[in-house]
């Protein structure tokens, strides 16, 4: 039976590794929801609970291949994203894949920093040290990204000119996503 502290560590990590990216990826499309905001927030809460369950599964049942857990989480996230947002496929795919790549980068950078600071703890899974470092890196990266989304990215998404570029530009972050998937 896992102890309470390890359980809380897994839960905090699970939410810290999902919620900032989920919220930031839907931010530019906040005026294009298919459902009322209350329903969207209910879906977000449900995804948070599912992510906690998946994080607990990953932390305390390490014999299960991590690719299965990753695929389940990814499919749920993609299904939510495309079910809740009503926008051009290319715009949504580009945003979702770019945010996923940023998430992967933040996780990798955080693990490297943890290894430099606390090498013994870096070899263990779901440790508070990694979660704290990851949250600090998220703040450093995602706060400026939020302002970029607000001032630059969202107005570009709302422009009517250049719509044809969105048909193919999502392939660029997809390429990086595939590379991340096979390297990790």
State what each model feature region is.
Residues 1-19:
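Hydrophobic transmembrane alpha-helical segments in integral membrane proteins
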Residues 44, 48-51:
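N-terminal, Lys/Arg-enriched amphipathic/low-complexity engagement segments
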Residues 19-39, 53-184:
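Juxtamembrane segments at transmembrane-helix boundaries
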């Amino acid at each position: 039976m896992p102890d309470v502290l390890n359980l809380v560590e897994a839960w905090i990590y699970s939410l810290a590794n999902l919620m900032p990216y989920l919220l930031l990826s839907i931010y530019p499309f906040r005026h294009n929801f298919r459902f009322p905001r209350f329903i969207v927030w209910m879906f977000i809460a449900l995804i948070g609970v599912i992510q906690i369950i998946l994080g607990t599964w990953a932390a305390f049942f390490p014999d299960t291949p991590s690719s299965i857990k990753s695929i389940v989480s990814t499919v749920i996230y993609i299904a939510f994203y495309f079910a809740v947002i009503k926008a051009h496929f290319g715009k949504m795919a580009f945003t979702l894949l770019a945010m996923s790549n940023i998430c992967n980068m933040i996780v990798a950078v955080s693990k490297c920093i943890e290894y430099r600071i606390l090498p013994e703890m870096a070899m263990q899974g779901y440790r508070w040290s990694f979660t704290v470092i990851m949250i600090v890196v998220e703040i450093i990266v995602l706060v400026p990204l939020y302002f970029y989304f607000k001032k630059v990215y969202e107005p570009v998404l709302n422009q009517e000119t250049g719509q044809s570029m969105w048909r193919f530009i999502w392939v660029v972050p997809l390429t990086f996503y595939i590379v991340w998937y096979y390297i990790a």
